């Protein structure tokens, strides 16, 4: 975390002072009474531990947007939260690493108009059809993950600022991807097939969601007040939320989320 090296230096000064003079006055960066000698010794070894929480904003998106998605009528990011614990290790006054364990939710709800959008639907009477859908499609995605980011950190000459970057690895605990279509038609069995008018039909691809995901995380932290830090990150998935052999949706959907939160450095 920002200022780890600076805190270690302050801790050294304080320990030397207490050993020689018995004066337990602490420097500003480690004055909090909850910090005991073990925490200070951990700082001397370059380790710090933080816990934090925050919000995630984003969605699962194709890159680039395909021609089959003609118009996005609405987008709802839903309420996505995260809780995280992070261990920080400094190697030099500037460079270090961060290893985290994050419990997070990701989701979105979209309403779009599409043309020849390949998918499989189930009509209200139970009939199953697959092909190119033309018309409105409403999608809701919601999943819970355990995520491990492994980051390199850099602290600026002003130790209140730090940036970080590195890979993350996520395991999905549970997830849903479903929705419905209405007032359109589907060309079946493919985009060149016969038109079939559809008033309302549903789809559910929850069982096809990928269990393991990975990507890149970049971000920064600001030391706002004593032990309180403000954090902002961008997580960009490098594999889609569906496995590559899932062809019902003909393009990959990458999880792309920005996070904003706070953490407390012990």
Per-segment meaning from a language model:
Residues 51-55, 81-89, 101-103, 148-154, ...:
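Residues on the lipid-exposed face of transmembrane beta-strands in outer-membrane beta-barrel proteins
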Residues 78-82, 92-96, 143-147, 158:
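Short connector loops at helix/strand junctions that flank enzyme active sites
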Residues 94-97, 159-161, 226-232:
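Repeated loop/turn-to-beta-strand initiation elements of outer-membrane beta-barrel proteins
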Residues 6-87, 265:
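Short glycine/proline- and aromatic-enriched beta-strand/turn motifs that initiate or cap beta-hairpins
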Residues 59-78, 106-144, 172-213, 217, ...:
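Extracellular/periplasm-exposed beta-strand and loop segments of Gram-negative cell-envelope proteins
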Residues 7-15, 40, 161, 166, ...:
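Membrane-proximal, glycine/serine-rich, low-complexity loop/turn segments characteristic
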Residues 41, 250-252, 259-266:
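Ligand-binding grooves and catalytic loops that recognize ribose/phosphate and carbohydrate rings
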